Amino acid sequence: MLYYLMLVPAVLSTAVIYFLSPALSYWWLLPVLLGCFVAANLVYVLLMFVCSLFAGPNRMYDRISPFYLALTLALDGWILALCRIKIHVEGLEKVPTDSEFLFVSNHRSNFDPMVQWWVLRRWPLAFVSKPSNMRKFVIGPFVRRCCFLPIDRENARNALTTINAAANLIRAHVCSFAIYPEGTRSKSSKLLPWHAGSLKIAQKANVPIVVGTVEGTERIARNVPWRRSHVYVRIREVIPAETVKATTTNALTEDICGKMRAALGK
């Protein structure tokens, strides 16, 4: 989306320059258009930098900022377009529209949250992620304003604080949450052991669990910029809130992982 929005001021600027400079040759139109496109992108980056200064670096927010969300989602779509990522989606109709939920998925690449957040952009959705992602230049403050939460898996008490915070936001109907229970990327594409405690978010908030899978993101870095990457996002099943509440996290983990391994063939 942002990719095309940047073309609008670039084309308009090029048209103005052309009509104000009658002696300008047609051969100069393409370089001028390219220069205006780059300039428009630089202005957007500058805007994001300035806006990031107004977001608290360590603060947890209790509502999503529509302004920061719009800018971040636009950037997300822009990056996906520039990287020539074609997303194939299956089962999106299974995602609840009448309640919040916890979204869980396998994790193969740093592109996973970008792809899946874009696919689920119709739903207010925040991610639980590692603390280092919240400290990233410019992006960190932006995702915090979108209610993303850091989780310290090395400290059980801090992790529980994050789980409770996510559950509270869900109960307050602020947003749904997404988490990768593996806790890190699988470099072999095989499903890694899950942190069962991640599912406590759904139990505490009394919401369903949406189980998704992602395939193909592990090839994006190798394909850019020469080849298009095909990524497959599938919504496998939705576990009702009643079942989530009545089942232990270990049993839920065993059931979900078993089905996910069978679906992925790993």
Task: State each model region's role.
Residues 100-102, 174-180:
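Residue-level preference for the first positions of well-ordered beta-strands
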Residues 166-167, 190:
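Soluble extracytoplasmic domains of inner/organellar membrane proteins
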Residues 52-73, 81, 97-156:
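Catalytic core of membrane glycerolipid acyltransferases/transacylases, capturing the structured
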Residues 137-141, 145, 175-178, 187-251:
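A cross-family acyltransferase "interaction/gating" segment
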Residues 1-18, 22-100:
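Membrane-anchoring hydrophobic helices of lipid-metabolizing enzymes
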Residues 89-90, 149-152, 241:
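Short acidic-hydrophobic, aromatic-tinged amphipathic segments that line or gate anion-handling sites
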